[in-house]
Amino acid sequence: MDDGYECPFEHLHDTEAGAKACKRVAVTREAETWLGTPYHHMGRVKGAGTDCLMMLAEVYEAAGIVPHIEVSFYPPDWHLHHDAERYLYGMMRYAREIPGPPELGDVALFKFGRCFAHGAIVIEWPSLIHAWHSAGVLYADAKQPQLAGRPVRFFDPFV
């Protein structure tokens, strides 16, 4: 992401913590540029349409955290009919599971249906940015009824 942004931790880049802090900020800044993007199953175009999985892939790629990720077709209701943890195992390829509390830019995966099937970017727990099927990309609170009480796992993609 090259938008003229200057990392506030630039003076700490020679430390692992400083470089990681800048990456976390870059992820959240990129995620904010997706706000208002309509929901579209398997879409991955900012401003035109995305779902929660594709938004994560595009945001972390644009911020330089992961390479381009090709995702094979999945039906919109895959999580209702399968026990296979496709999303969870895919996340584990690119991020390390952490016990929490999550930090800025970490990923929260929520259980929907029979498996972990909804991802969001943590802003400041429980504040999130995610793509919601009825509303598109928006800020949310994990304490809202749609997410509250659901099993959730956290991942650090900055490893």
Locations of the language-model features?
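Non-catalytic ligand/cofactor/substrate-binding and regulatory segments of enzyme domains
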Residues: 2, 7-12, 18-37, 143-159
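...with weaker cross-activation on analogous glycine-rich loops/strands in unrelated enzymes
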Residues: 21-28, 71-138, 142-143, 158-159
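Generic structural signal for secondary-structure transition and capping sites
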Residues: 36-39, 96
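Surface-exposed patches in mature extracellular/periplasmic domains of secreted proteins
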Residues: 39-43, 67-72
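Residues in well-ordered beta-strands of folded domains
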Residues: 40, 129, 155
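Active-site nucleophilic cysteine motif
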Residues: 44-63
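N-terminal non-globular leader segments, chiefly Sec-dependent signal peptides
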Residues: 47, 65-66, 70, 88, ...
